[in-house]
Amino acid sequence: MRLLILALLGICSLTAYIVEGVGSEVSHRRTCVSLTTQRLPVSRIKTYTITEGSLRAVIFITKRGLKVCADPQATWVRDVVRSMDRKSNTRNNMIQTKPTGTQQSTNTAVTLTG
């Protein structure tokens, strides 16, 4: 009897785990229903993503975590994306060109006299 209950409990747990995994990829999909025409200040935008689908859009994510969909063909949207890309490239270049200090000599040659 205990074995039967343990087996049923195991099956229920496994089923719950599998069912959760099946629908999880849908909830992560980002879609826009409408596009804003109101210009967003670059200083308030943290990052952006571009979606391809039934409604093509740029999703700006503000520093407060709000997601705002905008038309990728709008001039102001292209300007903001270019500005964000420039900031990102500048940060990456600064990180890559940081001085690492002086490098220790790795010469391990030994001269033997004999």
Swiss-Prot record:
Report keywords, A-Z.
Chemotaxis, Cytokine, Disulfide bond, Secreted, Signal
Q: Which GO terms describe its biological process?
A: antimicrobial humoral immune response mediated by antimicrobial peptide; blood circulation; cell chemotaxis; chemokine-mediated signaling pathway; inflammatory response; positive regulation of cell migration; signal transduction
The region called Disordered is annotated at 91-114
Q: Which InterPro entries match?
A: Chemokine_b/g/d (IPR039809), Chemokine_IL8-like_dom (IPR001811), Chemokine_XCL1/XCL2 (IPR008105), Interleukin_8-like_sf (IPR036048)
Q: Name one GO molecular function term.
A: CCR chemokine receptor binding
Q: Which cysteines are joined by disulfide bonds?
A: C32-C69
Q: Where in the cell is it found?
A: Secreted
The entry's function note states: Chemotactic activity for lymphocytes but not for monocytes or neutrophils.
Q: What GO CC annotations are associated with the protein? A: extracellular region; extracellular space
Q: What is this protein called?
A: Cytokine SCM-1 beta
The protein's superkingdom reads: Eukaryota
What Pfam families is this protein classified in?
IL8
Organism the protein comes from: Homo sapiens
Q: What residue range is the signal peptide?
A: 1-21
* Chief site of localization: secreted
Q: Into which family does the record put it?
A: Belongs to the intercrine gamma family.
